[in-house]
């Protein structure tokens, strides 16, 4: 009998059981939290992850277009195109998307963190944020290198302008600050304008998460 190596991605997901008038109903923990308008963005930003997050946001909008969505981010970054699919959907849908950094938000993760609804972007106390310029790699014939180099520079300029708008920083400052890996603590992220507040405790129940 062969021993199958442990794959953490296939580890059991916790289940929760609810009592209803029709009996018991079980959910995996992420589906149960989705009912509370909570979405997780954990790990590398790539097309499959982006597709799932976009689908969840569209579903929650259809369920209640007036209720805020909470996007919890713990990501080292990843694909620009996949990240922009999430970003554009955040802006396209009617509900505000509140972003919360848990662990880390680096690269595209930091960009999406800053792109949450103004006044509703948060870091937990020991989270960290890292901003830098887009990374690119290309293999092909020499005549295509210039084309791809121009595209990477265009993406860099666009993302810097968007981050400047989200943070309130000057474009030139953002361009300088993202030229190399730039790590920020939770409070430094507030000072920079990437997030609005460090959350050490859950806000009071009087602070409604629904739009008025």
UniProtKB/Swiss-Prot annotation:
InterPro entries: ClpP, ClpP/crotonase-like_dom_sf, ClpP/TepA, ClpP_His_AS, ClpP_Ser_AS. GO terms for biological process: protein quality control for misfolded or incompletely synthesized proteins. Coiled coil: none annotated. It catalyses: Hydrolysis of proteins to small peptides in the presence of ATP and magnesium. alpha-casein is the usual test substrate. In the absence of ATP, only oligopeptides shorter than five residues are hydrolyzed (such as succinyl-Leu-Tyr-|-NHMec, and Leu-Tyr-Leu-|-Tyr-Trp, in which cleavage of the -Tyr-|-Leu- and -Tyr-|-Trp bonds also occurs). Its main location: cytoplasm. The active site is at 107 (nucleophile), 132. GO terms for cellular component: cytoplasm; endopeptidase Clp complex. Its EC number is 3.4.21.92. CDD domains: S14_ClpP_2. One of its GO terms (molecular function) is ATP-dependent peptidase activity. It is found in: Cytoplasm. Keywords: Cytoplasm, Hydrolase, Protease, Serine protease. It holds the Pfam family CLP_protease. The keyword Cytoplasm applies. HAMAP family: ClpP. Belongs to the peptidase S14 family. Fourteen ClpP subunits assemble into 2 heptameric rings which stack back to back to give a disk-like structure with a central cavity, resembling the structure of eukaryotic proteasomes. Cleaves peptides in various proteins in a process that requires ATP hydrolysis. Has a chymotrypsin-like activity. Plays a major role in the degradation of misfolded proteins. This is ATP-dependent Clp protease proteolytic subunit. It comes from Pseudoalteromonas atlantica (strain T6c / ATCC BAA-1087). The gene is clpP.
């Amino acid at each position: 009998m062969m021993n199958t190596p442990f794959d953490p991605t296939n580890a059991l997901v916790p289940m929760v059981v609810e009592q209803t008038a029709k009996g018991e109903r079980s959910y995996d923990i992420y589906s149960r939290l989705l009912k509370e308008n909570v979405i997780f963005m954990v790990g590398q930003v790539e097309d499959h992850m982006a597709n799932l997050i976009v689908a969840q946001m569209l579903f929650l909008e259809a369920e209640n277009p007036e209720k805020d969505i909470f996007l919890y981010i713990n990501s080292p970054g990843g694909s620009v195109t996949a990240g922009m699919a999430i970003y554009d959907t955040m802006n396209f849908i009617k509900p505000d998307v509140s972003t919360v950094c848990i662990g880390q938000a680096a690269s595209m993760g930091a960009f999406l963190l800053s792109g949450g609804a103004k006044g509703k972007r948060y870091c937990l106390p020991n989270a960290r944020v890292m901003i830098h310029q887009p990374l690119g790699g290309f293999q092909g014939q020499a005549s295509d290198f210039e084309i791809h180099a121009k595209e990477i520079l265009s993406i860099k300029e666009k993302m810097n302008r968007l981050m400047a708008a989200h943070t309130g920083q000057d474009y030139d400052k953002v361009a300088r600050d993202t030229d190399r890996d730039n790590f920020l603590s939770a409070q430094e992220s507030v000072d920079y304008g990437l997030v609005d507040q460090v959350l050490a405790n859950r806000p009071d129940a009087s602070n409604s998460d629904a739009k008025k």
